[in-house]
Regions:
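Alpha-helical junction/boundary sensor with strong preference for TPR arrays
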Residues: 16-17, 51, 85-86, 102-105
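Alpha-helical adaptor scaffolds
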Residues: 1-2, 9-68, 72
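Extended alpha-helical scaffolding segments
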Residues: 72, 88-89, 97-108
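Short coil/turn linkers that connect adjacent helices within long alpha-helical scaffolds
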Residues: 14, 47-48, 105-107, 111-112
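Alpha-helical linker/edge segments of TPR/alpha-solenoid repeat scaffolds
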Residues: 33-38, 67-77, 107-108, 112, ...
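Alpha-helical solenoid repeat scaffolds, predominantly canonical TPR units
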Residues: 8-12, 43, 74-78, 82, ...
């Protein structure tokens, strides 16, 4: 009964441009618990575009993409979560793992947007590598 009501509550969650962070994250958790991912990835993507330092939103997006079988995107979102937490070495590790997956052509990786994902991941890998190098020269 509880799962039915949580499923009904998740089904009634709607996101708009006026959705607050709290509504997005709480509604997103309800949708994840109910296994209803429709629209959640889009809402989270829209959110992180305007709030790139929101580690929790990136982490939820990573979980959504993982459940949707979007392994590379999931790893990239996890990396962005680490960047938001200023853990650049961990972010770089995840980005390199995503690059390896793309190069290896592992199952669940290739898709119609694989070249776009690869370009974003390559760019972010260079940016994070530069941040790490800059930090090393300061110390």
């Amino acid at each position: 009964m509880a799962s039915s009501s949580s499923g009904e509550a998740a089904a009634s969650v709607k996101f708009s441009q006026n959705t607050t962070r709290a509504e997005l994250l709480i509604g997103g958790r309800a949708m994840l618990a109910a296994g209803q991912l429709g629209g959640l990835a889009d809402a989270l993507q829209t959110w992180v575009v305007t709030h790139p330092k929101d580690a929790q939103a990136w982490q939820m997006l990573s979980e959504v993409w993982s459940r949707q079988g979007e392994a590379v995107r999931s790893i990239r979102a996890d990396a962005e979560s680490r960047v938001a937490q200023l853990d650049y070495p961990a972010a770089l590790d995840r980005l390199k793992a995503a690059q390896d997956m793309l190069r290896g052509g592992q199952a669940g990786v290739a898709g119609r947007n694989a070249h776009i994902d690869a370009s974003i991941i390559d760019t972010r890998t260079r940016q994070i590598s530069n941040l790490i190098r800059e930090a090393a020269t300061v110390w």
